[in-house]
């Protein structure tokens, strides 16, 4: 929903041709069977009855949103999917918000938000905005990495949010929250709006 609000504010489409997001990659110029959902999520629909799909990942490392497998970029990949799955890959240095209600689309998105952090690199900062129903931003979460420390800070109103460090199964410690394990990676439950995570 935030991407739809941004499209209204800035004019950049929510569903983007690959060449729009990766203008310097010649391989993206003619791709018409996959697209970017916003600036960080790549979607490759399955057009084959057998479930076979070929798709191209631009430069970098990409993580599947649900399966959590990692694939290298700058190359083509071939996979098989069923009716309940498809390639949905997330770029590194992405902070993504997942909701906590799969029964209806309209609810308080800032309550129980499950943030997902995908491979934040040294010196990089990731940001995620959670919208209210009117499209305005009700909560903004930022994560910045310096060395082995990730500083996380939130601004605005949010309740019961968590942060999952995708494909990181162990951390040295956390200040400002508690940690638990999951199949996707360490999940940190925030006690306030700031966290300091030591990898």
Where do the model's predicted regions map?
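Catalytic core of carbohydrate-active enzymes
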Residues: 1-158, 162-168
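Solvent-exposed beta-strand/loop surfaces of large extracellular or lumenal domains
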Residues: 65-83, 173-193
